């Protein structure tokens, strides 16, 4: 066990500066000095360190300044009164910075000594507690509370996450960030039971149930649940094409069309089908594709006996028998067996037309409509 009383003295944690430096401190800094010195003294007494009161402590307890400033009365030197402001020469600014740094170091020393003392007392009463460091730390006074008080004087981020080390200036932002680690979702929808980590997300979700659509297009009157949906829809009226391909310069109205186009430049297709010439990026994709030519269907439905060329198609087919519709529209609640069916349905809400004719630029919401249109050009 560490001999705590022999290893710590008041001088180890005292904040020392000259009378000249004291005269340069402003009201807030002098008040902070009072708090620190008295707190140091009380903390050392509380952990059993025998300390003789120094002249500085006696003066501070009596409401006097450690160093008298010429021309200033005693009653003007208390923390509650207005401190005399002295012009601060540039060469003395470093002294004030060093003072604040020493305050922070002092608080850290006190905190460390208190933890050592409490740990020694705890383990002497119950030696088995040495094996449970984590559980012991949880019973200690919060480390952040004291440090955050100090950081408020230096402008540092006060609230630090113990999980990832990210720091925040505001407690509200810190609490919100912590939920990312704990996965807490306290905001639950009373209609469907779905939970969210933020109240704003719950409010947005509840618009599905009450049918609220506050964002209205000024051109055609169509209403939308989210502002982002309105912005995308308005491109139909303005003709805006914000997505430009850096490879060929072609522009697109919809992000989905743009992403699909970019793949034509970036995807390397090294596996070619000997039957139809279609290329694939992976050999496994080519192997699955070849079943269309051979007619091979190794995956059979156990309910109706229908066979399929790959497992994904079989799984989708079986939903016809089970009635499962896992893909639900957040706008109207309608559910679908296939994800592609959901995506096609959602276009009716957004007004998006991702299928664009290469000849004339006319866009369509359904690919089948584009195919029919292209026959005009051929």
From Swiss-Prot:
CDD domains according to UniProt: KRAB_A-box
Free-text function comment from the UniProt entry: May be involved in transcriptional regulation.
Keyword Manganese: no
Zinc finger (C2H2-type): 159-181, 187-209, 215-237, 243-265, 271-293, 299-321, 327-349, 355-377
Organism in which the protein naturally occurs: Macaca fascicularis
Subcellular location field: Nucleus
GO molecular function, one term: zinc ion binding
Record key words, sorted: DNA-binding, Metal-binding, Nucleus, Repeat, Transcription, Transcription regulation, Zinc, Zinc-finger
Keyword Metal-binding recorded: yes
GO cellular component: nucleus
Protein's UniProt name: Zinc finger protein 684
Domain spans labelled KRAB: 8-79
Main location: nucleus
InterPro entries cross-referenced by the UniProt entry: KRAB (IPR001909), KRAB_dom_sf (IPR036051), Znf_C2H2-type (IPR050758), Znf_C2H2_sf (IPR036236), Znf_C2H2_type (IPR013087)
